């Protein structure tokens, strides 16, 4: 489900109830951990206020508060190399109930109110800080290779020079095609990838309400290792197999890990 989080505090609890009902009737069960991937697109403007500094300060505060929520298994913010004002929030929860309880927490509501334009009143002149509404998609775990995404043993260095490479890929198989075959191909590719030098973690996810949509989370020691695998014959073979099954091209996003410091125009940097 596309869960738009453009809601005021008064709407949050009703939305959560409807969300749970929607998941209950969908084809992909919400049993087990829920992986929530949120796109965070901040306007790169400094006048009349610095949107990036306001938004990322709110984001880091939200992340730190969320890590103590019941059922939290992992909470990372990764910064897109191609456009540093774009990030992805990847949080993992023990269950759908835990995820919904997290959304109802005051720090979750306050974060969304802090960074999104709200319908007036109040405050009618407020216009900070993101370029498009926060949206997130929830996934179930299909298969994990090497270290789990939730492992604290994965690299924790931040910034361009210190971070491992965190790759998020979105895969949209044709709904009237053969998503099951596509899933099998993804899992086999994950297994092959896990044996490659520099590969630290590979996770295959399936979107809860749209079973033809998948995502992969990869962690690589270096971008050089990742690029070498992208040019490997096994990757080319995988692409040749899945291309006829796709409803849209694979969407690869290469990221670095965020810590506590963000620099306008540069992105996440060490403290």
Enumerate the language-model features and the residues they cover:
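Bacterial N-terminal signal peptides
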Residues: 9-20
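Short, well-ordered beta-strand segments in beta-rich or mixed alpha/beta enzyme
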Residues: 33-41, 76-105, 165-172, 203-232, ...
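Short, surface-exposed ligand-recognition loops at beta-strand->loop->(often short) alpha-helix junctions
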Residues: 41-57, 172-183
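N-terminal secretory signal peptides that target proteins for export/translocation
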Residues: 1-5
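An amphipathic, aromatic/His-enriched active-site/gating alpha helix that lines ligand/cofactor pockets
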Residues: 61-76, 92-138, 192-200, 219-256
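Boundary at the C-terminal end of the N-terminal hydrophobic targeting segment
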Residues: 22-24, 30
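Surface-exposed beta-loop interaction hotspot
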Residues: 124-173
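Surface-exposed interaction/gating patches
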Residues: 152-208
């Amino acid at each position: 489900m596309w869960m738009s989080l453009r809601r005021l505090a008064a709407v949050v609890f009703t939305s959560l109830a409807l969300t749970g009902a929607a998941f209950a009737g969908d084809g992909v069960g919400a049993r087990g951990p829920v992986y929530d991937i949120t796109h965070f697109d901040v306007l790169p403007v400094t006048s009349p206020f610095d949107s990036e500094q306001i938004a990322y300060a709110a984001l880091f505060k939200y992340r730190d508060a969320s890590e103590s929520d019941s059922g939290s298994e992992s909470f990372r913010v990764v910064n897109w190399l191609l456009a540093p004002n774009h990030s992805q929030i990847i949080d993992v929860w023990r269950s759908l109930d835990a995820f919904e309880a997290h959304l109802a927490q005051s720090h979750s509501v306050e974060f969304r109110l802090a960074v999104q334009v709200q319908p007036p009143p109040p405050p009618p002149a407020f216009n900070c800080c993101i370029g498009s509404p926060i949206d997130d998609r929830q996934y179930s775990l299909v298969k994990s290779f090497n270290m789990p995404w939730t492992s604290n043993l994965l690299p924790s260095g931040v910034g361009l020079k210190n971070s491992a490479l965190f790759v998020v890929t979105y895969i949209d198989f044709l709904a009237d095609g053969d998503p099951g075959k596509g899933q099998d191909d993804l899992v086999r590719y994950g297994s092959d990838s896990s044996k490659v030098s520099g590969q630290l973690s590979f996770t295959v996810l399936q979107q809860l309400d749209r079973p033809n949509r998948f995502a992969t989370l990869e962690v690589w020691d270096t971008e050089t290792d990742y690029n070498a695998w992208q040019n490997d014959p096994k990757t080319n073979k995988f692409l040749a197999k899945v291309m006829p099954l796709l409803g849209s091209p694979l969407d690869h996003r290469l990221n670095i890990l965020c810590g506590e410091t963000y620099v306008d125009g540069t992105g996440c940097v060490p403290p």
